Amino acid sequence: MIVTVKFFAAYQEAYGCSEMRWEFPDNTPVSAVLERAIAQHPYLEQWRELTRFGINFEFVSRNTLLKNEDEVVLIPPVSGGLSMNNE
């Protein structure tokens, strides 16, 4: 099956693009997308436990099975924004 993988933040920096199409066998969990990314770019290991998964615009657990033509997002932690501290 083929899925579209969308990259943000550290993942986009690692791949130098915002998305790729990857092939996986049937009955593959979404966590395999992260495993492939870490295998190809080992320094992404630091984000393994902090990354969330999205499939077709919904947050999912790491054990959710992929389906052909799914759109997968690896969501690393984000920072920034406004501080609520007035110091």
Annotate each predicted stretch with a short phrase.
Residues 1-87:
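Ubiquitin-like/PB1-type beta-grasp interaction modules and other compact soluble beta-rich domains
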